[in-house]
A protein has these predicted regions:
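PLP-dependent class I/II
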Residues: 1-11, 15-21, 26, 31-41, ...
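Conserved N-terminal alpha-helix of the aminotransferase class I/II PLP-enzyme fold
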Residues: 72-107
Length: 412
């Protein structure tokens, strides 16, 4: 039986209003190159390659053998995990949290952030975020139906002044300000007084704050990233997301947390209660062990990233790109020499580098208009691979003429 009219799938306006996913072309070429047998050095994704602590993996295995742990968990996280998160905040940042009402476990911070946007935002609402920005900070509010206003990124009073001037021109005023320090993709950092000023601004304007603190424990050269929740009045106006992904090399485990304002946590818990039954219990149990028994691990991992940062920065000096040496995160944000771009935008440039240098980079344009001209370099490979990547880029961008051979002296 034939049908003259093809069946049409009509997707929702929620999908249609999403901005283009600019990493798509990069990921497609990376896949095709690898299928063809090309050894691509992937510095484009912040995906840790170092191992999780052995005892954490052992605890996961042990817990997975207990049939009781194969049942549904609870959507807000087991009580032992929430208590451990609260204890870590007390120990590390001097913050007091009620594990029952001010802490919730999420299936990675991206899931938690996305569901929080559904809980707080809807059509007609507006959020403000810096540009460039981690893509989910744009996509999740858009999927919730909210308008996204981007303000050129900064880490000082001038940035907050730009935000306030932007708010003055908006009606109704925005509901949410999204802040992310140490920043992804730029690795920009702040001092503690930034949070005091941001909280004062948001209290004046009745705007909620969401702090993405995913890289809070990945710090270099003695720098210590300040937690939003350590600032006076923080819990009155907002929440903070953290994750096990970067500090303990548990990215694929998908274990994150949201802490802070009890009403915002309750709204997130309500949404999660409809959407999921929480993460696999053995992952939660192993995460408790990671935080309780491995307080030395995040600083050790940070020292490793600091060393890799130095390797990459030396390579960039040779290539001829500029950068601000990062004090935190697992990225270097580098400005491409305009001569190397050859008139291309950063997406086409990164495609060319994958072709000519077998190196995958994250194009700055994928993070926003103010990222154009930059690339994000992830410190996820070992020293040898990082040096090779820098050498490959240098050869592709700065071809050097071979030295002429000396003529041999004539003999009689």
């Amino acid at each position: 039986m034939s049908h003259s009219t093809p069946f049409k799938i009509d997707v929702s306006s929620r999908i249609l209003r999403l901005p283009p996913y600019l990493f798509g072309r990069i990921n497609k070429m990376k896949y095709e190159k690898r299928v063809a047998g090309v050894d691509i050095i992937d510095l484009g994704m912040g995906n840790p390659t170092d191992p999780t602590p052995d005892s954490v993996v052992a605890k996961l295995t042990e817990a997975a053998r207990d049939p009781r742990n194969h049942r549904y968990s609870v959507s807000n996280g087991i009580v032992g995990l929430r208590r451990e998160v609260a204890e870590k905040y007390r120990r590390q940042y001097g913050v007091t949290l009620d594990p029952e009402s001010e802490v919730i476990a999420t299936i990675g911070s991206k899931e938690g952030f996305s569901h929080l946007c559904l809980a707080l935002l809807g059509p007609g609402d507006t959020i403000v975020v810096g540009d460039p920005a981690f893509p989910i900070h744009i996509y999740a509010p858009a999927m919730a139906g909210a308008n996204v206003i981007r303000v050129p990124l900064g880490n000082d009073q001038a940035f907050l002044d730009r935000i306030e001037r932007t708010i003055d021109g908006l009606y109704p005023p925005p509901k949410l300000l999204i802040l992310n320090y140490p920043h992804n993709p730029t690795a920009m950092t702040i001092t503690a007084d930034f949070w005091d000023r941001a909280i004062a601004l948001c209290r004046r304007r009745n705007i909620m704050i969401v702090s993405d603190f995913a890289y809070g424990e990945v710090c270099f050269d003695g720098y210590q990233a300040p937690s939003f929740l350590a600032a006076e009045g923080a819990k009155e106006v907002g929440v903070e997301f953290t994750t096990m992904s970067k500090s303990y090399n548990m990215a694929g485990w998908r274990c994150g947390f949201c802490c802070g304002n009890a009403e915002m946590i309750k709204a997130l818990a309500t949404i999660k209660g409809y959407y999921d039954y929480g993460m696999f219990a053995p992952i939660q149990i192993a995460s408790v062990i990671a935080m309780r028994e491995h307080s030395e691990f995040p600083p050790e991992q940070s020292r490793l990233y600091q060393h890799r940062r130095n390797v990459v920065c030396r390579g960039l000096d040779k290539i001829g790109w500029t950068y601000d040496k990062p004090l935190a995160s697992m990225f270097v944000w580098a400005k491409i020499n305009p001569e190397h771009l050859k008139g291309q935008d950063t997406i086409d440039f990164c495609l060319r580098m994958m072709d000519e240098a077998a190196v995958a980079l994250a194009p700055g344009k994928a993070f926003g208009d103010h990222g154009e001209g930059y690339v994000r370099i992830a410190l996820v490979e070992n020293d040898q691979r990082l040096r090779q990547a820098m050498a490959n880029l240098d050869r592709a961008l700065n071809p050097r003429q071979p030295r002429p051979r000396r003529a041999k002296a004539a003999t009689a």
